[in-house]
Amino acid sequence: MAKLTMDEINSVKGKGFLRNRGTDLFSGRIVPVGTVFTAEQLHAVAELSEKFGNGKMMATSRQSIEVPGIAFENIPAAIEFAEAHDLHFGGTGAKVRPITACKGTTCVFGMYDTQALAKKIHETYYVGWSKVSLPHKFKISVGGCPNSCIKPSINDFGVEGNREGGKVVYKIYVGGTWGKSCRMGTPLSRKVEEEEILPILEKCMLWFRENGYAKERFGLTIDRVGFENLEAALASDDLLVRKEEILAAEIKQKP
C-alpha cells in the first residue's frame, strides 16, 4: 500500500483511530456508555482485536479501550463490526471527550449513582454534542464522594458527591488539567443540587466556546477572562438563551 498522507491519517483520527508510532497501523478507541462495558461487549472487543488488530487491548485513562494494530484499509470493516455489536469508536478531537466516573454506583463510599449520571452526560453531551467544536478538548469526570478516586478536580468539569444536612449535594470543579500543564480545578462558590449539574455544565461549555481561543484549555480561558466572569455567567440563563448563536459562531483565534 502507498504511504499514507496526513489527510488520510487525520481523517481517521477524527473517528477515534490513532496512528501507531513508526507504522501505518492504528489503535482504535472504543468508548463505553456511562463508563460500563457489558460482558457481551468485551467478548466482541476481543473478537474485533483478533480479526482486525494484533490481538491486544489496552484500557485508557478515560475508561475506554484501545485496540492497536489495525491496518488503515481495515478501519471501515472494524467500524462496521463494532457497530453491529453496539460498540462505537471515538474519543478524539477538540470536543467533549469520553466521560469518566468512579464506581460510586456500587462502592460503599459512593453517595449516589455515578454511572447513571455519567450515562446521562454521555448521551446528552458526548453523543449529543458530537458535532460541536470547542476551542480544545473538554474532559468531564463524575466522582461519588470526597475521596475523589476519579480525580474530578483535574478535569475541565468535575463533579464530586458531598453530604450536607443529611442529603447529597454536589461540588463542581471547573478548569482542571493534568499533564504537561497542570491546573487544579477551581470549585464553584456553592454546592449544587443534582438537577443543576447538566445546566451548569452546558453553560460552562457555552461560555468556553464563546470566550476560549483555539487550542486553549478551559482552565486557561478562566484564568485569562476571570473566574468571577464565569460565575456571573453561570448565575443567569443568558448563555442558554444565546445557545444557537454561540454554537454557530467561529472559534476565536488568539490575537
Model regions and ranges:
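Class II aminoacyl-tRNA synthetase catalytic cores and aaRS-like
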Residues: 225-237
